[in-house]
């Protein structure tokens, strides 16, 4: 594909292009090139030093190449610059630790089976005033679905939604969330790789618009103790030959039920990837509609997996534990491979619940076979190390991921010890704010 084809739908002629990829944490990284080098970036790639990118290479062997994916070209409406995602190469071959490449390989496995995965995310975020400290100021007092005077950020949300189509995102619903200054803008589902790209773009738009209004936007899972956390529920369906194969005659198909079985089977290990930060586990506590118990049910928001009340081609499942700190490429790859394992081995879903699982006593949960998700990043990493299917979903990136996250956990424990804080504290620490606030 040449540059003229890439820009066929463009309305302006930016002088620079941002080459965007993500590190092991899902944080966007990149570089700018003159627009005149875009064709080179597509065909030959642009070299860069991978040693300073978290979770990539050491300084002794750090040369990497970024090749632009021309299908992702967009122009930033408020700046004289375009953006493009791409893939990382090393020594002429796809780089194993490239998160986007990890998801691409999983999608190719699905394609061999004639399957496409569609995912719709619900990323939540807070808007805070800037005050030069970690004493976070809340700019509004609205609550869930509040409108008009109580939602002080309604104009900001509208502005975000107006910019989204320029990046290929279709906004669907804008609303205030449960927490004061907490918000959600849902955008239309798409194929898994496009949705992962869209999540990165969405965060970029939200933060840029907030900045203009003198605010900080954070997707940190639990920025304030005692307030609801930020989740990122994922709506998932699989399609084959234009048909939703999660669709059954009455409700879900056997394929969908086995996919649920796979997610339940691998849920503990998956959590290390869908909830990959110390702070993630301060959201996953009872009382805030964040799932804690490994269970599933129809229309039941207390379960880990909810089946929404949509049938026919709208049939899907909602995986409720992920949060916006997840690297979406890793998270989607792991979830899809866990679900496929369930389909392959015909894993029947277990721990079905119709009532509020939080209100059950321990005996009832035990009777229904309901287990709990890991209670900390350390516990989640232990589960990941034991789960071959989820490990292999990350491919060569697994080694980098587990090493990086083990160091992160150890650093947090050292901080707690130095501050004489209990290991199981659910308070949000300054260590977390410094590390995760700008996720």
Swiss-Prot record:
It catalyses: L-glutamate + NH4(+) + ATP = L-glutamine + ADP + phosphate + H(+). L-glutamate binds at residues 229, 283, 289, 301, 320. InterPro entries: Gln_synt_N, Gln_synt_N_sf, Gln_synth/guanido_kin_cat_dom, Gln_synth_cat_dom, Gln_synth_gly_rich_site, Gln_synth_I, Gln_synth_N_conserv_site. Its EC number is 6.3.1.2. SUPFAM superfamilies: Glutamine synthetase, N-terminal domain, Glutamine synthetase/guanido kinase. ATP binds at residues 172, 235-237, 301, 306. Binds 2 Mg(2+) ions per subunit. Residues 99-439 form the GS catalytic domain. SMART domains: Gln-synt_C. Its cofactor is Mg(2+). Residues 12-93 form the GS beta-grasp domain. Keywords: ATP-binding, Cytoplasm, Ligase, Magnesium, Metal-binding, Nucleotide-binding. PROSITE patterns: GLNA_1, GLNA_ATP, GS_BETA_GRASP, GS_CATALYTIC. One of its GO terms (cellular component) is cytoplasm. The keyword Mitochondrion does not apply. It is an enzyme of class 6 (ligase). It comes from the Archaea. Mg(2+) 2 binds at residues 124, 177, 184. Gene3D superfamilies: Glutamine synthetase, N-terminal domain, Glutamine synthetase/guanido kinase, catalytic domain. Oligomer of 12 subunits arranged in the form of two hexagons. Probably involved in nitrogen metabolism via ammonium assimilation. Catalyzes the ATP-dependent biosynthesis of glutamine from glutamate and ammonia. This is Glutamine synthetase. It comes from Pyrococcus abyssi (strain GE5 / Orsay).
């Amino acid at each position: 594909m040449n540059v003229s084809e890439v820009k066929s739908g463009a309305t302006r002629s930016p002088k620079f292009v941002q080459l965007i990829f993500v590190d092991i944490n899902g944080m966007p990284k990149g570089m700018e090139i003159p627009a005149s080098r875009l064709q080179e970036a597509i065909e030959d790639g642009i070299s860069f030093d991978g040693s300073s990118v978290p979770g990539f290479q050491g300084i002794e062997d750090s040369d990497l190449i970024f090749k632009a994916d021309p299908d992702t070209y967009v122009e930033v409406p408020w700046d004289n610059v375009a953006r493009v995602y791409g893939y990382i190469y090393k020594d002429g071959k796809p780089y194993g630790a490239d998160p986007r490449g990890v998801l691409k390989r999983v999608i190719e496995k699905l394609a061999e089976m004639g399957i496409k995965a569609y995912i719709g995310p619900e990323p939540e975020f807070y808007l805070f005033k800037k005050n030069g400290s970690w004493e976070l100021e809340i700019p509004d007092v609205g609550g869930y679905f509040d409108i008009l005077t109580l939602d002080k950020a309604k104009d900001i949300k509208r502005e975000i939604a107006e910019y989204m189509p320029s990046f290929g995102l279709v906004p669907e619903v804008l609303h205030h969330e449960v927490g004061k200054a907490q918000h959600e803008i849902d955008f239309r589902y798409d194929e898994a790789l496009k949705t992962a790209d869209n999540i990165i773009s969405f965060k970029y738009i939200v933060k840029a618009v907030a900045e203009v209004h003198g605010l900080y936007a954070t997707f940190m899972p639990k920025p304030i103790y005692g307030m609801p956390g930020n989740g990122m529920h994922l709506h998932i369906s699989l399609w084959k030959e234009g048909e939703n194969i999660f669709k059954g005659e009455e409700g879900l198909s056997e394929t969908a039920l086995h996919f649920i079985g796979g997610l339940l089977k691998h849920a503990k290990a998956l959590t290390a990837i869908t909830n990959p930060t110390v702070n993630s586990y301060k959201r996953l506590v009872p009382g805030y509609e964040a799932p804690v118990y490994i269970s599933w049910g129809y229309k039941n928001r207390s379960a880990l997996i909810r089946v929404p009340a949509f049938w026919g081609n709208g049939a899907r499942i909602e995986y409720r534990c992920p949060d916006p700190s997840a690297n979406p490429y890793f998270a989607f790859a792991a979830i899809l491979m866990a679900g496929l394992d369930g389909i392959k081995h015909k894993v029947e879903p277990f721990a079905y619940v119709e009532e509020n699982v939080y209100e059950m006593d321990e005996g009832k949960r035990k009777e229904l076979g309901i287990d709990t998700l890991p209670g900390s990043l350390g516990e989640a990493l232990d589960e990941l190390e034991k789960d071959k299917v989820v490990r292999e979903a990350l491919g060569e990136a697994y080694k980098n991921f587990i090493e990086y996250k083990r160091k992160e956990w150890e650093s947090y424990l050292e901080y707690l010890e130095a501050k004489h804080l209990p290991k199981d504290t659910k308070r949000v620490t300054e260590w977390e704010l410094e590390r995760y606030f700008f996720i």
